[in-house]
């Protein structure tokens, strides 16, 4: 008798709402925690669960942002070895970000993400709305 291969455990599914927050020239990103999946990398702001447009608007206002326009984006999925992210997204135009005083988001020119703030490919469905290349893509071209 040959040893039997253990069956793979099903991946854990995490629902997320990804936000592409812009003020015209700047976009919001934030740093991921130092431990865990994609540790220490930058990401687009995202929230647990699939939020409605009204829930997203409420969250933005709680963060001290003033949304002008919001548009729903297509759903996306990213598969890691042990986790699947099932994502929905919104692109949000807000008033000037210069006066934002929140603690965990950075507002940068999207081109700066290419060199200084690489964003993981897990967010590729939404980074197109920033018109930037992802962290890995800049190395693939060389």
Question: PLM features: residue spans?
Answer:
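Intrinsically disordered, low-complexity, charged terminal extensions of DNA damage-control enzymes
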Residues: 1-142
